[in-house]
Amino acid sequence: MVLQTANFQINPEDELSLLKKFQPDKPGMVMEYWSGWFDHWFEKQHHTTSVEAFSDVLERILKFPASVNLYMFHGGTNFGFHNGANIQDEFPHYLADVTSYDYDAPLTETGDYTNKYYACKHIVAKYNKVLTKVPSSPVVSKKMAYKPISVTGQLNFNQIIDRIAPEDRTKSDSVVHMEKLPVNNGNGQSYGFVLYRHAEVAVRVNSTLQIKNGAFYDMGIVLLDGERKTEKLTSTSQLLQFGYWETKNAKLSLISASYGTRTLDILVENWGRVNFGVHATFDQRKGLLENTKILLDDEEVTGWEIVSLQFKSKWVNSLDAWGPVSSHMTAPTLFLATLQVDTPYDTFLDMRGWGRGAVFINGFNLGRYFSAGPTHSLYIPAPLLKTGTNHIVVFELFTAQAQLVFTDKPILGPE
């Protein structure tokens, strides 16, 4: 017999009474008492709940009585490309989670104690019928705002693609979503970016590109001969335009100074997947789906090279021959900076001023940043740093800065 449990944040008596009605002879269990909530890109503020509201519901759960599991007690960080997403009925329907999973939990992203933690400790002790020896609390980690460092090298978009190994390149007559690509020993691509490239398309001065019978999952950037033709993403209203999941059969004007044979690149970023919902929710193939046609001036473009950009640690660490930094950025670019460390401490990158992308420290993927917020920092735990030289690589899609700035506090957004 399965033990049914409850998930909620408010109205504990109503929820637990309903649970007891379904299984009167079973113990009450709250499998997820939501201590806060996660944040999504484009939201105006960092989600929080008050200590008073949190404490009130927690005490009422234990008083009912029922057992409880906090979601979250410590949220931590969505390192790499592993952030999840939510869905909703209203626009924009799909909501990608930010990299920080601070969640306004009793322990912060860095493991620091909060007033919620102390309230939780007090309430649990009050209702604990068994005398328990409580160990000493671990010492809070020291945080350091290292001095800003200059960006010293870059690789342009074509240089990046030239460094992708043959086993991550696929020839296909039509476009294919990343999960079906014959990469990773035939297991497909799960995360990152996928590039659809055609080296010889005939472009007119005012050519039009159309995604027929499909859309982008989740964001598409179009380039002609390495020059970006799609706008920088800054607002949710743009999600209704060409380049995103909201609008099928969207069109883009490829305004060009001249006509001729060009290299067409369509770079698609997987923003993260949803892990719950109805059956239809779980069709979460990323990139450009099968049966999608790419039309240039109403003619289908066929014969693609599909390149998997997975940013695995070994590949990031292998990058070399960095060129000088250019002040004019026309396409997604990799940037290099070097941090000298005497003693590693926890720190944060302050990514305000950058556009959208991901950061790697000594090959480790810290996760995504995005100027849309609400979060503008990336957490670097001390164990990811080493005494001496640390290499920081930034993959920026839109707008770069000349420096990387550190802070000793997270920038999670207005509360």
What are these regions (language model features)?
Residues 1-70:
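Substrate-binding/catalytic cleft of secreted carbohydrate-active enzymes
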Residues 15-20, 39-44, 80-84, 223, ...:
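Short, solvent-exposed loop/turn and secondary-structure capping segments
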Residues 31-36, 60-66, 73-303, 311-323, ...:
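Carbohydrate-binding surfaces of carbohydrate-active enzymes
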Residues 48-55, 63, 192, 214, ...:
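Short, glycine/acidic-rich beta->alpha junctions
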Residues 123, 248-263, 335-342, 377-389:
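Short, surface-exposed tryptophan/glycine-enriched loops
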Residues 190-201, 329-342, 378:
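Short beta-strands within extracellular/lumenal beta-sheet-rich domains
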Residues 207-225, 264, 339-362, 369-370, ...:
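Aromatic-lined ligand-binding clefts that engage carbohydrates, nucleic acids, or primary amines
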Residues 378-415:
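Terminal leader/tail segments of proteins
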